């Protein structure tokens, strides 16, 4: 839904598919909004398993964007990398979460001009085992039963989303295929916040997509 929002709003879009070994730009010149998405890795992943993945390069690029004070939204792994770019240390989430579960806004979240539109609680997507670290200036805006850091604000222009408001049926099918249906069923039996493939496909993702659009519109019009 992030890409669709940018297309719908008529933005000029460039992308770097690091999983296809595309190189990051040398500068952030010409970029006014950086969205860093997720992946199966952690910020300190052993590169032998993912030779294309260079977290140090991604973090350095994000630090350039921070210094330039452009808009940044990090999603899942991108949220964790943003926290490291700010000097924090990512951490393992208390619970692994896969599926749709509610996030609850904190008092700070209810007061945040861009996030408060989510309401007190919002059903969002999840597919993670880690979470962003915190720094002295970080503000937790939303939590869930399984993870205390679902949305974190690092500055008025820089937000970390551990939750996936962008999920849609196509993305879910790709994620199920990547993890495997039997693996997910096994995880569902062993862990409290993992849904079955059938549950994942039955979820309605439209409301969270709408709320994501509202957030992105609010952020970029501030």
Roles of regions detected by a PLM:
Residues 86-170:
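Pocket-forming structural segment of enzyme catalytic cores
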Residues 7-72:
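Flexible gly/pro-rich beta->alpha loop and the following alpha-helix that scaffold active-site loops
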Residues 1-5:
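Short, surface-exposed "cap/lid" segments of acyl-processing enzymes
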Residues 65-89:
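Catalytic nucleophile loop
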Residues 166-222:
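Acyltransferase
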Residues 53-57, 144, 204-212:
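Soluble or luminal CAZymes and related metallo-dependent hydrolases
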Residues 39-40, 79, 165:
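Active-site metal-binding loops of divalent metal-dependent hydrolases
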């Amino acid at each position: 839904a992030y890409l669709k929002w940018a297309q719908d709003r008529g933005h000029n879009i460039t992308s770097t598919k690091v999983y296809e070994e595309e190189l990051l730009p040398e500068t952030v010149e010409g970029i006014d909004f950086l969205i860093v998405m997720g992946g199966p890795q952690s910020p300190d992943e052993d590169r032998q398993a993912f030779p294309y993945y260079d977290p140090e390069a991604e973090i350095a690029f994000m630090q350039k964007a921070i210094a330039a004070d452009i808009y940044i939204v990090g999603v899942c792994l991108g949220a964790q990398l943003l926290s490291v770019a700010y000097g924090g240390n990512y951490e393992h989430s208390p619970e692994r979460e896969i599926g749709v579960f509610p996030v609850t806004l904190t008092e700070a979240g209810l007061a945040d001009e861009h996030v408060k539109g989510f309401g007190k609680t919002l059903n969002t997507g999840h597919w993670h085992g880690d979470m962003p670290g915190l720094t002295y200036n970080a503000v937790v805006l939303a939590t869930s039963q399984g993870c205390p850091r679902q949305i974190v604000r690092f500055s008025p222009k820089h937000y970390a989303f551990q939750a996936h408001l962008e999920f849609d049926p196509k993305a879910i099918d790709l994620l199920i295929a990547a993890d495997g249906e039997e693996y997910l069923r096994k995880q569902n039996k062993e862990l409290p916040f993992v849904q079955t493939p059938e549950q994942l496909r039955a979820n309605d993702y439209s409301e969270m997509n709408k709320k994501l659009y509202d957030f992105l519109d609010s952020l970029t019009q501030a």
